[in-house]
A protein has these predicted regions:
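Alpha-helical transmembrane segments and their juxtamembrane interfaces
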Residues: 12-13, 75
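N-terminal signal peptide c-region/cleavage motif recognized by signal peptidases
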Residues: 15-17
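N-terminal, post-signal peptide beta-strand-biased segments of exported outer-membrane/organellar beta-barrel
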Residues: 19-127
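Outer-membrane beta-barrel porins/channels
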Residues: 21-46, 116-446
Length: 446
């Protein structure tokens, strides 16, 4: 176990160092609680193209269906840590911008409470905000221009505590039903600003405007999950997974200002200030509605040899509102509305033969594809767009310690957006370590 914690410490230190030294410019992350890339951004999901709802095993933790924790074996302690490196290319109007980022994808653990009750806890990145966009436009009837600068940074993390139960399980080769739930704590902050900067030979007589907002999130959400397994003969098993994210209104704390200023040399001097909240106060509370989310997964497995799986997910984001309770929205009418979100993923491959005599036979080789109809719909003068994403990925599993632990290496490509607006192409490499230790064992001595 000491080796496991040593590897964990080194991986955590490396991941935090990479995160501190790199960033990714994602303009779409300026809306709502920013870009939620789960589950595809984690190596567990990426190894099969984003398939997660019907997957469960004794040597890894799947936080995307809480019912899967019930597959953890008695006397076991499973610990997972994963990281991801991403190289992105943003295409905007024929211009390309490249970025590189490293993130700690997940830290999870799971262990049994009783033979029928298992528990899990972990930390996941829920969303990330990182963008800076500059647009320069002429002012009608003048020789001056106005430069609009969009800035944003921050992110939301998710700490979860989950429990799963064997509703019925008559033994190996018999049908089984597992049920579980996750209690999620979302926390973090997102800072956004828009600056209207007048560009001229002498800007001393121009009043610039800045809108800025900081949103602090601290909320509890819930996920529910079911997993049913039906043996088909002696060799095959059909699994059906169902998940549900409970809809609710999230209370968030905001701090916002809209003010004008002038610049003399390198100094800014504030003139007039508007407080968007009710009353003469920069701090206020607003509401963000979190919609229902439903996930359904099907998989067919042949005796721990190969697997094929299909996922479908739906979230009715249309009608979702942002900055409720604010008399004067900080960012005004941005032309953005939310659209229903759909995701489909298909994956499979050789998952490894644990009894194979050659090591290559115990290795796993999997892959998959996914398509997602995005959360945002842009209502622009030239037409309507939905922001869609598609991607492909591969995964290689290296078993360790007689198959109780494993190292998963993944690689993937995804494309988000459109050529008519903005397109973000991402190459990613993931690394996940799952350690399955035998705890809670009473040793016998003669």
């Amino acid at each position: 176990m000491k080796k496991c914690f040593a590897i964990f410490s080194m991986a955590l230190t490396f991941s935090l160092a990479v995160m501190a030294q790199s960033s990714t410019n994602v303009p779409f992350s300026q809306y709502g609680l920013s870009m939620n890339t789960l589950p595809v951004s984690t190596p567990l999901a990426e190894s099969m193209g984003g398939v997660v709802f019907s997957r469960a095993g004794s040597n890894f933790v799947n936080p995307f269906n809480p019912a899967s924790y019930a597959s953890i074996q008695p006397e076991s302690f499973v610990f997972d840590i994963a990281m991801s490196l991403q190289s992105s290319r943003l295409n905007e109007g024929g211009q390309q911008y490249k970025d590189f980022a490293g993130t700690l994808s997940s830290i999870t653990l799971a262990f049994p409470i009783t033979s029928w009750w298992k528990t899990s806890a972990g930390l996941l990145p829920y969303s990330k905000t990182e963008y800076r966009t500059v647009m320069t436009q002429p002012i009608a009837g003048t020789t001056q221009n106005v430069k609009t600068i969009y800035d944003g940074t921050g992110g939301i993390s998710q700490f979860y505590w989950g429990n799963a139960f064997n509703v019925w399980n008559d033994g190996e080769g018999k049908p089984s039903l597992q049920a579980g739930f996750n209690l999620n704590y979302l926390y973090g902050s997102v800072a956004r600003a828009i600056t209207y900067d007048f560009v001229a030979s002498d800007t001393s007589f121009f009043q610039d405007t800045r809108r800025q907002q900081e949103t602090r999130v601290s909320n509890i959400t819930f996920d529910l999950g079911l997993l049913y397994r039906q043996p088909l003969g002696e060799k095959y098993t059909l699994s059906v997974g169902l998940t549900c994210g409970v809809p609710q209104s999230l209370k968030v704390d905001d701090k916002a200002l809209i003010y004008t200023f002038v610049t003399y040399g390198s100094s800014e001097y504030t003139l007039d200030t508007i407080f968007p909240a009710r009353g003469n106060n920069s701090e206020y509370e607003s509401t963000l509605r979190q919609p229902l989310s439903i996930g359904l997964g099907l998989s067919l497995e042949r005796n721990q040899r190969w697997m094929v799986a299909l996922d479908a997910a739906y979230s009715p984001y249309s009608g979702m509102k942002y900055e409720e309770g604010v008399e004067t929205p900080v960012f005004g009418n941005s032309g953005i509305c939310y659209a229903d979100n759909y995701r489909i993923a298909f994956g499979g491959g050789w998952i490894g033969n644990p009894t194979a005599t050659r090591y290559i036979g115990r290795m796993g080789l999997t892959g998959g594809v996914h398509y997602e109809k995005g959360k945002l719909a842009l209502a622009l003068a030239s037409g309507d767009w939905t922001l869609d994403e598609w991607g492909v990925s591969l995964g290689i599993t290296f078993p360790m310690r007689k198959g109780r632990s494993q190292l998963v290496v993944t690689g993937g490509y995804s494309s988000f957006g459109s050529n008519d607006l903005l397109r973000n192409d991402v190459l990613s490499v993931g690394l996940a370590l799952s350690s399955n230790e035998r705890w809670f064992v009473k040793r016998k001595y003669n």
